């Protein structure tokens, strides 16, 4: 959980700060492809934010193609090679 340590500031939305931070971890390969992200409640408690904030972050990451969800199993980092290929044609 240490890699998810983030000092939130009051200048911008918490969910955007967390989204950008996790996205950067994924892009920088600090969270590997197919690695499971922390459960929503656990990450929310760790970051001292509401569960809904993390839900919003995970939904945005999924919409942007950085993660995928498996019902009953969790949220996982997507294959970034496929994301890069997809972006070529967008």
Locate predicted features:
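N-terminal basic, amphipathic alpha-helical segments
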Residues: 1-90
